[in-house]
């Protein structure tokens, strides 16, 4: 393991232990971090620090379970069990760590943080999808659905983040051939988003999404945009790039996400979610990586364009009013 990321793994230990708020969680964590399986070291004991470092070190480095077991002088099955147990524990914490703001005060604070970026008003979050490369699924008849537009096998991770790159919502495990607007419809947040954005808020998405009162998109540039529309798009991109940076930071911090070699897509999805939990914990602890390693230039982001359904086109005409009102501010 690279020293830098092993150090990061060690820094995650205390964050992981502190993330459980109740005594029952603490007891559960103790059981998970000290599994009575064939975990053998020289002194026949695996302490919590070693266990956490094994799991976090695996997440933060592009390494294998075999290499982790050799590094910590434990059996392969022990390292495998440790990683699975910590992932399960993190997923149990996810409802408390990855959650959408509910109160009016929370929403106002988040909106003000976004407004401070470029002046774009009433933004509650930024949404997008990203590909995470995986091993080809076992079932050959579905393998082609996991080949993305870059001709690589992957799953899509949909994320919604705040201005500090912290995830509000994560949905993953969907075959990468499915476009972003369809992934949103399939996700749990898809039906809840209109209510969560009441009374005046919205999330920002790229042109892959249909415009909604609660989901604003940029103006498509066919060479005939007005100066006001160009200013709208500029401020929009300056704000929406936060989700690109959130994905970049996630993948930079957890190098295992460069390519996941799990045999089951379900296991892959669980691991991605666990990394997102740790990502949020790190942000809460203000543990950041140098921006130059993950920041994306808004001008370099290529918009995706997909045809919408007829019903979407009708709704778009109604929801265009809000975008026009915001455009008039610029």
PLM segments and residue spans:
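Short helix-capping/turn signature of helix-turn-helix
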Residues: 57-61
């Amino acid at each position: 393991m690279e020293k830098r990321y092993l150090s990061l793994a060690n820094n995650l230990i205390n964050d992981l232990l502190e993330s459980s708020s109740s005594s029952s969680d603490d007891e559960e964590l103790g059981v998970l971090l000290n599994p009575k399986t064939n975990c053998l070291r020289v002194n026949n004991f695996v302490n919590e620090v070693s266990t956490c470092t094994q799991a976090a070190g695996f997440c933060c480095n592009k390494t294998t379970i075999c290499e982790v077991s050799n590094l910590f002088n434990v059996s392969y099955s022990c390292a495998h069990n440790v990683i699975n147990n910590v992932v399960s524990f993190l997923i149990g914490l996810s409802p408390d760590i990855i959650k959408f703001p509910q109160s009016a005060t929370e929403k106002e604070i988040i909106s003000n943080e976004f407004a401070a970026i470029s002046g774009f008003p009433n933004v509650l979050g930024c949404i997008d999808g990203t590909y995470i490369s995986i091993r080809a699924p076992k079932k050959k008849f579905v393998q082609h659905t996991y080949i993305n537009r870059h001709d690589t096998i992957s799953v899509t991770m949909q994320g919604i983040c705040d201005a500090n790159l912290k995830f509000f919502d994560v949905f993953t495990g969907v075959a990468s051939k499915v476009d972003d607007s369809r992934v949103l419809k399939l996700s749990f947040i898809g039906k809840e988003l209109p209510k969560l954005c009441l009374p005046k808020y919205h999330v920002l998405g790229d042109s892959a999404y249909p415009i909604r009162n609660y989901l604003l998109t940029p103006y498509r540039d066919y060479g005939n945009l007005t100066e006001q529309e160009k200013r709208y798009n500029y401020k929009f991109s300056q704000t929406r790039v936060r989700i690109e940076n959130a994905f970049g930071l996630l993948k930079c911090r957890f190098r295992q996400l460069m390519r996941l070699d799990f045999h089951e897509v379900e296991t892959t999805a669980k691991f991605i979610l666990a990394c997102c939990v740790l990502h949020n914990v790190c942000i809460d602890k203000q543990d950041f990586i140098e921006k130059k390693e993950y920041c994306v230039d808004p001008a370099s982001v290529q918009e995706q364009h997909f045809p919408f359904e007829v019903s979407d086109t009708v709704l778009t005409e109604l929801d265009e009013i809000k975008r026009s009102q915001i455009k008039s501010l610029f």
